[in-house]
């Protein structure tokens, strides 16, 4: 399971022109679900993402996590993250989970986040328009 996390001052996602999720300070989490992923991996990744210290403390050091700054998260499914890009000029998607399992694990990941802090979501498998102001910019790729 892959999370591309971005520290944001604001982020939103729209489907058919309607906002489905919107946050201020926090993390935009683009989530890619791979074939071998399960609930245990989702739980480990949530714990890692929510405790990852990428927010600045009073001394300007990245020493605080999203919970410590009372931030929120916006979780957006991103089936392209597990793509195989090693050769050729077209990505392969055989490493990604099938849509039924991917949606179930996306929902599970989002529900686990929601137990800890305010969580907004995109819409699984929809054509989404994601807007964000990346604060830094600060972006990390986390994988379990």
Swiss-Prot record:
Coiled coil regions in record: none
One Gene Ontology term from the biological process aspect of the record: D-amino acid catabolic process
Catalysis performed (reactions): glycyl-tRNA(Ala) + H2O = tRNA(Ala) + glycine + H(+); a D-aminoacyl-tRNA + H2O = a tRNA + a D-alpha-amino acid + H(+)
InterPro entries tied to this protein: Daa-tRNA_deacyls_DTD (IPR003732), DTD-like_sf (IPR023509)
Keywords: Cytoplasm, Hydrolase, RNA-binding, tRNA-binding
A GO cellular component annotation in the UniProt record: cytoplasm
A Pfam cross-reference name: Tyr_Deacylase
Protease is among the record's keywords: no
GO terms of molecular function: D-tyrosyl-tRNA(Tyr) deacylase activity; Gly-tRNA(Ala) deacylase activity; Ser(Gly)-tRNA(Ala) hydrolase activity; tRNA binding
Subcellular location: Cytoplasm
Catalytic activity, EC: 3.1.1.96
Sequence intervals crossing the membrane: none
Positions occupied by motif Gly-cisPro motif, important for rejection of L-amino acids: 136-137
Main location: cytoplasm
Role, per record: An aminoacyl-tRNA editing enzyme that deacylates mischarged D-aminoacyl-tRNAs. Also deacylates mischarged glycyl-tRNA(Ala), protecting cells against glycine mischarging by AlaRS. Acts via tRNA-based rather than protein-based catalysis; rejects L-amino acids rather than detecting D-amino acids in the active site. By recycling D-aminoacyl-tRNA to D-amino acids and free tRNA molecules, this enzyme counteracts the toxicity associated with the formation of D-aminoacyl-tRNA entities in vivo and helps enforce protein L-homochirality.
Protein family: Belongs to the DTD family.
UniProt remark on domains: A Gly-cisPro motif from one monomer fits into the active site of the other monomer to allow specific chiral rejection of L-amino acids.
Quaternary structure and partners: Homodimer.
Protein name: D-aminoacyl-tRNA deacylase
Species whose genome carries this gene: Aliivibrio salmonicida (strain LFI1238)
């Amino acid at each position: 399971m892959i999370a591309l996390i971005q520290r944001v001052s604001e982020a939103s996602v729209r489907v058919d022109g309607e906002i489905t999720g919107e946050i201020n300070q926090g993390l935009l989490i683009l989530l890619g679900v791979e074939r071998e992923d399960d609930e245990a991996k989702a739980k480990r990744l949530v714990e890692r993402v929510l405790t990852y210290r990428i927010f600045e403390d009073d001394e300007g050091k990245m020493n605080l996590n999203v919970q410590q700054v009372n931030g929120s998260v916006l979780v957006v499914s991103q089936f392209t993250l597990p793509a195989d890009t090693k050769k050729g000029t077209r990505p392969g998607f055989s490493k990604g989970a099938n849509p039924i399992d991917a949606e179930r694990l996306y929902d599970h990941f989002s529900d686990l986040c929601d137990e800890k802090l305010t969580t907004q979501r995109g819409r699984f498998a929809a054509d989404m328009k994601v807007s964000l102001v990346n604060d830094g910019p600060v972006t990390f790729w986390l994988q379990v």
